[in-house]
Amino acid sequence: MFRPITVFFSFCLLVSLTIVSITGCGDVSDDPAAQTPEQEIVSTEWVKSAPDFKLLSTQLEQVSLSSFKGKVVLLDFWATWCQPCQVEMPIFEQLHHQYESKGFSVVGISVDREKLAVVEPFIENLSIDYPILFADEKVFQEYAIMALPTAVLIDRQGKIRHRFEGSTGSKENYVEVIEKWL
């Protein structure tokens, strides 16, 4: 038979361990990761060759990444139904025009299944005039797209130098990285 005190202490220990495992042991208010907003940027330095592709554009022309050779390119993977993508696109439009004369280009890659019927009115509504292409399964896999929006910065030599996952909501986050590679 169990003694009542032993059962009581066992129960208290179990409850305490459960609370600690759920809430953690430390004060998370000083932990930067605990303060990161849900749509915060995830950026990574990359040094690998960007896979070339040939994708259909909104003008119904085949466009390849190699046609941007010698430029710094920001590939923006997005969809019309993605709210954070809608926040980023006007920022990318500004960046495209701000740095175009310095050899920079934004290339949007839509993952929408409806393609032209949905994408064309969407980009007209946002006044987007940088090139928009339609993703295929291969480019989606080669660039390891796991979230939208995802932006991939490619340097003049065709190397992937930076990757942004999620919406930064801030032009400055992109400016710092773009200017580094111009």
Regions found by a protein language model. Name each.
Residues 1-52, 173-176:
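N-terminal targeting signals for export/organelle localization
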Residues 34-36, 153-182:
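Thiol-/selenol-based redox modules, centered on thioredoxin-like
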Residues 46-47, 52-73, 99:
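A short beta-strand-turn-helix
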Residues 69-71, 101, 128-129, 145:
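Active-site acidic short loop of glycosyltransferases
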Residues 71-73, 77-81, 88, 147:
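Short pre-active-site segment immediately N-terminal to redox-active cysteine/selenocysteine motifs
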Residues 87-126, 135-142:
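Structural microenvironment flanking redox-active thiols in thiol-disulfide oxidoreductases
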Residues 120-157, 165:
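Short, internal strand/loop/helix patches
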